[in-house]
C-alpha cells in the first residue's frame, strides 16, 4: 500500500520474539561505570555519557607549554644561516611533540645569550603558561642563564640525568610552574622531551597512560653498552615479511646533533 490507514503489510518471514526491541539497561545497568577517569571522550563516548544522563562533566584543561630556544648562533628555519650560525630546528620539533602529547604549544622565540633578554622571555612564559621548556644553554661551556635564574628565584630539583643523549637536563620550579631545560642538540632535546616532558604533560591532561607503548623487537646485530647509564639509540625498524618479527638495526652514528 501507500502507507496510509488501511494499507496492508505482508511479512516474508515470521517475527521473532524480542527482535528489534531495545531493552532497558541493555548497554549499562544502574551503578555501572560507563567511562573511566583518564579516558579520552571521543564522539562515541560523548553519546554514551549522554545516554547515561551526563550532558556535561569535568575534564582536564589543555596545558599551555611555553617553548624558548636559547643561543646567539640560532636563526629562524626560514633564514639562511651566516657563518657560525645554525637554523633553529628544536623549536619546531618541540612544538610538534608538545602538540602530540596533548598540550597547546606557545613559541616565545629565539633568545640570544643575553641574561636580561632570557629572563624577560622566561618570566613572560611562566606567567602565561603552565609548563616552560627551553632548549640550549644547558651544556658545559654554554651561557646557562636560565638555570641561574631558576636557582635564584625558584628551585632546581636536578641538573643532570644518567642517560644519553640528554645528560645535561635541568628541571625545577619557577613561579610554581615546572621548568625543563633541554640540551641544544636535537637528538638530546628529543629524548629529553620524550622521557620527561611527555609523561608530565600527559599527567597534566589527566590521561591514564603517560609514556608511549613499548614493543619487543630483535636486534639484527650486537650492541655494546659503552657506559653505566641508560642509552637511547637511533635505529630503523622493519618487520620480517615471513615471520612478522620486528627487526631493529642501530644507526651507524649516534651523534646527538643528528635526528635522522
Residue ranges and their predicted role:
Residues 31, 187-189, 220:
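Phosphate-binding chemistry for phosphorylated carbohydrates and sugar-nucleotides
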Residues 18, 42-43, 72-76, 187, ...:
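Short, acidic Gly/Pro/Ser/Thr-rich loop/turn segments
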Residues 11, 23, 86, 209-260:
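C-terminal terminal segments
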Residues 2-4, 25-28, 41, 56-61, ...:
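Solvent-exposed alpha-helices and their adjacent loops that cap or buttress functional pockets
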Residues 1-112:
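Short, glycine/charged-enriched hinge/interface segments at domain edges or termini
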Residues 85, 91-93, 100-214, 226:
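Short glycine/threonine-rich loop/turn motifs
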Residues 10, 34-35, 66, 107, ...:
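Structured core elements
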Residues 19-21, 49-56, 167, 205, ...:
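Glycine-rich, charged/polar anion/phosphate-binding loops
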Amino acid at each position: 500500500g501507500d502507507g496510509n490507514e488501511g494499507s496492508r503489510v505482508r511479512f516474508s518471514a515470521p517475527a521473532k520474539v524480542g527482535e528489534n526491541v531495545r531493552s532497558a539497561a541493555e548497554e549499562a545497568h544502574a551503578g555501572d561505570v560507563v567511562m573511566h577517569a583518564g579516558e579520552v571522550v571521543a564522539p562515541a563516548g560523548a553519546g554514551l555519557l549522554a545516554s547515561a544522563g551526563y550532558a556535561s562533566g569535568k575534564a582536564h584543561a589543555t596545558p599551555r607549554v611555553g617553548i624558548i630556544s636559547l643561543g646567539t648562533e640560532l636563526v629562524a628555519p626560514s633564514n639562511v644561516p651566516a657563518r657560525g650560525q645554525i637554523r633553529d630546528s628544536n623549536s619546531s620539533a618541540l612544538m610538534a611533540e608538545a602538540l602530540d602529547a596533548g598540550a597547546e604549544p606557545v613559541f616565545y622565540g629565539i633568545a640570544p645569550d643575553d641574561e636580561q633578554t632570557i629572563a624577560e622571555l622566561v618570566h613572560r612564559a611562566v606567567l602565561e603558561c603552565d609548563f616552560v621548556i627551553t632548549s640550549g644553554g644547558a651544556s658545559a661551556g654554554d651561557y646557562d642563564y636560565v638555570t641561574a635564574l631558576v636557582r635564584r628565584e625558584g628551585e632546581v630539583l636536578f641538573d643532570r640525568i644518567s642517560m644519553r643523549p640528554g645528560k645535561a637536563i635541568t628541571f625545577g620550579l619557577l613561579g610554581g610552574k615546572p621548568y625543563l631545560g633541554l640540551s641544544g642538540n636535537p637528538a638530546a632535546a628529543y629524548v629529553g622531551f620524550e622521557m620527561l616532558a611527555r609523561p608530565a604533560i600527559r599527567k597534566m591532561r589527566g590521561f591514564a597512560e603517560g609514556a608511549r607503548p613499548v614493543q619487543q623487537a630483535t636486534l639484527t646485530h650486537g650492541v655494546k653498552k659503552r657506559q653505566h647509564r641508560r642509552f637511547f639509540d637511533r635505529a630503523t625498524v622493519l618487520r620480517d615479511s615471513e615471520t612478522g618479527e620486528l627487526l631493529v638495526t642501530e644507526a651507524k652514528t649516534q651523534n646527538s646533533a643528528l635526528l635522522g
